[in-house]
Amino acid sequence: QMTCRISGEVFTWCGTTCPLTCENFRNPPKHCPQGCFVGCMCRRGLVRHRNGRCVRPPRCYY
């Protein structure tokens, strides 16, 4: 099992190519390239902050 270094991340063998971020979680991308992202992604319910961490959406504004 692969591990991720950043708190709130989980390793995936086939994650979305359009992960949610603080910039797009209110209006998620509608058209993502097909395929799988292999690597560490934020766990469900968390989004990627511009500082690289995984946060709950209300924390995007801090």
Curated annotation (Swiss-Prot):
Stretches that traverse the bilayer: none
Origin superkingdom: Eukaryota
Compartment(s) where it occurs, according to its Swiss-Prot or TrEMBL record: Secreted
Keyword ATP-binding attributed: no
Protein family membership: Belongs to the serine protease inhibitor-like (TIL domain-containing) family.
Domain called TIL: residue spans: 4-60
Its biological purpose: Serine protease inhibitor.
Species, as recorded: Scorpiops jendeki
Name the record gives this protein: Venom peptide SjAPI-2
